[in-house]
């Protein structure tokens, strides 16, 4: 892991996963943000793929999940002005003896709400980031999206301090 990746990792936190333990583990890693999300779904979330931003360029993830589902939705954020700040959804088994899968997802940005996609049935989950953003996803998938977790950036206090300094400087010029 290079110094940039280590620095990025130190500025992020992980939340989740929500869902079941079927399928195989995946982790897209840590990026600068999310540009687009593509969901295929019907009675559950069949698959998810994401286009992240890495140093100002798009970086496409693999598709996580199966080939089912007859509805497709593409969420195109107005990145970098718009970014993901929260996700909610539901998970439960598709059949009585099966393991839980993600049944529904709703995405919240700093500008609007996208969804819900899928069926809002089962155990609910929700989280939101106060001052940060979603910068990566991970989970488990097989025939469906079995579970989902997120890498979140922490608020960068230096940016906030610099903004405050500029505002204070501007105010002192007006008062003087």
UniProtKB/Swiss-Prot annotation:
GO molecular function: carbohydrate binding
Record-linked InterPro entries: Jacalin-like_lectin_dom (IPR001229), Jacalin-like_lectin_dom_plant (IPR033734), Jacalin-like_lectin_dom_sf (IPR036404)
Keywords: Lectin
Entry-linked SUPFAM superfamilies: Mannose-binding lectins
Domain Jacalin-type lectin positions: 12-154
Name of one Pfam family that matches: Jacalin
Family: Belongs to the jacalin lectin family.
Name this polypeptide is given: Jacalin-related lectin 19
Species per Swiss-Prot/TrEMBL record: Arabidopsis thaliana (Mouse-ear cress)
UniProt gene name: JAL19
């Amino acid at each position: 892991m290079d110094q940039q990746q280590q620095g990025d990792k130190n500025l992020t936190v992980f939340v989740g996963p929500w869902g079941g333990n079927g399928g195989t583990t995946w982790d897209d890693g840590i990026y600068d943000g999310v540009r687009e999300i593509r969901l295929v779904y019907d009675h559950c979330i069949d698959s998810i793929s994401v286009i992240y931003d890495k140093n100002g360029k798009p970086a496409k993830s693999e598709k996580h999940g199966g080939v089912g589902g007859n509805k497709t939705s593409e969420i195109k954020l107005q990145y970098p002005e718009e970014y993901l700040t929260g996700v909610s959804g539901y998970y439960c088994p598709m059949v009585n003896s099966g393991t839980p899968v993600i049944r529904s997802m709703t995405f919240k940005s700093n500008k609007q709400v996208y969804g819900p996609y899928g069926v809002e049935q089962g155990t609910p989950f929700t989280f939101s980031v106060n001052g940060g953003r979603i910068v990566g996803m991970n989970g488990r998938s097989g025939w469906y999206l079995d579970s989902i977790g997120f890498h979140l950036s922490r608020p960068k206090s230096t940016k906030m301090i610099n903004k405050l300094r500029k505002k204070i400087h501007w105010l002192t010029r007006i008062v003087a």
